[in-house]
């Protein structure tokens, strides 16, 4: 049964808050953690006042980390969800910066990542594992509590959620491209309340009118999200992605950097390997995939397993929401099946518009990967540990398959639907992907050849 709200006291997945926290996250830790807060403030390569921070100088951050008091007992007594979230954020930043600092300096000197430190010191590992346990999370930098949604503050408190008005409470590089990159994720989520309202409305709709109203709501939310997403090209310059990328790398899947894992001193005897921070932990596309039925077209392969694995890297309340949403929209309760059963032609067309937005999101996102990653580095693994060139396009194929199925149910001319025109646009999408996949199959391919095709077929995102 789908509930109207899913909350852990920090997030509340409902039509008021969407996927954003209930209120602005704490910018600073409580006084008992002053040494830790000072470390966070002094950490970025470039600090707020323009001076060089600890990560700028090789070895300086690691030295400072060892001076921090072990706050394990204090952390055990914390009950406030906002304090817990801010502590998780602080410790996860310290953990990633500490372990990956050598890889960062190796990259600056040699252009390759080199090795990370393999041990998280006890004074960080123990309180981090404790707060992670309280939140039901793995002790590693994540998207919700750490790097993105739980890491913003409004520069002008009366202003909105556009990325220009958002600052990062904790940062690695401290440069404007890092802020633009991750705060745009928060910005895009300002439309998630409508996405939730529409999705819940679709599940509960009693007739075509209610169904179509909520399909329209989802389509409009996704359209706004796509318009904001496209601003990535200016919010964060692709050539500067490597300034901060190394710090969000995960352990799992990145054995070149971390070997067989990380030792959490004083917590576990054996090494652990958790996945890294990635937009793949965001909830917009998973929600849209479930409600539109794209999820039923996911290929049965390792990528799908990876996306499902990432469910565990989300707050428990988000996991519950996605699980219930899926259970409420499966089989004959699925949106496509219900639209087919009532031959709701208007609804089918609204669903095609939703699928178009999911396609534009994924195709634009694939172009991010081509430019921000493939044009910048030969390292083929993403921060989440996936082989990027083969996996990302796979999900575009799932969208194209869902589109074909829905198109087969639509009638030419119903409510002015022009099937022929739709087909022409659809074929371009298929052609683009096939040609791009052909290029990336050659081991020494040139990323620019992949990117140029987007404009050639009129599907350029920038
Ligand atoms: C410069 C911008 C971006 C780059 C370079 C990028 C890169 C990537 C990469 C490499 C993956 C593969 C999985 C992994 O991490 O191992 C991925 C997956 C994903 N990313 Fe991003 N990403 C960007 C922006 C975004 C934004 C703004 C969102 C949404 C708010 C997002 C949502 C997703 C989703 C949902 C997936 C899972 C794959 C799918 O379902 O299609 N990404 N991203």
Language-model segments: residues:
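Surface-exposed peri-terminal alpha-helical interaction modules
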Residues: 1-462
């Amino acid at each position: 049964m789908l509930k109207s709200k899913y909350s852990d006291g920090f997030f509340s997945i409902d039509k008021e808050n969407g996927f954003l926290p209930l209120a602005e996250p704490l910018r600073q830790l409580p006084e008992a953690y002053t040494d830790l807060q000072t470390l966070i403030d002094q950490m970025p390569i470039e600090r707020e006042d323009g001076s060089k921070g600890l990560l700028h100088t090789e070895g300086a951050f690691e030295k400072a980390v060892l001076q921090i008091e072990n706050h394990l007992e204090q952390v055990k007594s914390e009950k406030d969800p906002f304090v817990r979230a801010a502590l998780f954020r602080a410790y996860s930043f310290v953990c990633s910066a500490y372990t990956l600092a050598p890889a960062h300096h190796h990259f600056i000197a040699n252009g390759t990542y080199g090795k990370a430190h393999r041990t998280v010191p006890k004074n960080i590992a123990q309180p981090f594992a404790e707060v992670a346990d309280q939140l039901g999370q793995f002790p590693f930098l994540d998207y919700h509590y750490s790097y993105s949604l739980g890491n913003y503050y409004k520069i002008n408190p009366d202003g909105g959620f556009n990325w220009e008005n958002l600052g990062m409470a904790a940062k690695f590089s401290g440069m404007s491209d890092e802020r633009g990159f991750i705060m745009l994720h928060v910005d895009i989520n300002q439309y998630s309340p409508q996405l939730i309202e529409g999705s819940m409305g679709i599940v509960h709709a009693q007739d075509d009118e209610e169904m179509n109203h909520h399909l329209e709501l989802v389509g409009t939310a996704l359209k706004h999200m796509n318009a904001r997403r496209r601003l990535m090209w200016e919010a964060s310059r692709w050539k500067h992605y490597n300034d901060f990328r190394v710090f969000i790398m995960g352990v799992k899947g990145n054995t070149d950097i971390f070997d067989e894992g990380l030792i959490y001193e004083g917590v576990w005897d054996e090494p652990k390997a958790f996945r890294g921070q990635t937009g793949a932990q965001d909830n917009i596309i998973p929600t849209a995939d479930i409600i539109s039925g794209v999820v039923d077209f996911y290929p049965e392969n390792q990528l799908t397993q990876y996306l499902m694995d990432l469910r565990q890297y989300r707050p428990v309340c988000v996991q519950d929401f996605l699980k219930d949403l899926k259970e409420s929209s499966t089989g004959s309760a699925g949106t496509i099946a219900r639209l087919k059963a009532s031959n709701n032609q208007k609804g089918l067309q609204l669903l095609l518009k939703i699928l178009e937005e999911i396609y534009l999101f994924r195709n634009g996102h694939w172009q991010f990967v081509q430019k921000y990653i493939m044009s910048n580095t030969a390292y083929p693994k993403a921060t989440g540990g996936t082989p990027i060139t083969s996996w990302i396009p796979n999900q575009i194929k799932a969208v194209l398959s869902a589109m074909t199925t829905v198109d087969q149910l639509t009638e030419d001319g119903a409510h002015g639907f022009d099937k022929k025109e739709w087909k022409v646009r659809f074929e371009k999408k298929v052609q683009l992907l096939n040609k791009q996949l052909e290029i990336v199959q050659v081991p020494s391919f040139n990323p620019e050849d992949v990117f140029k095709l987007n404009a050639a077929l009129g599907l350029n995102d920038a």
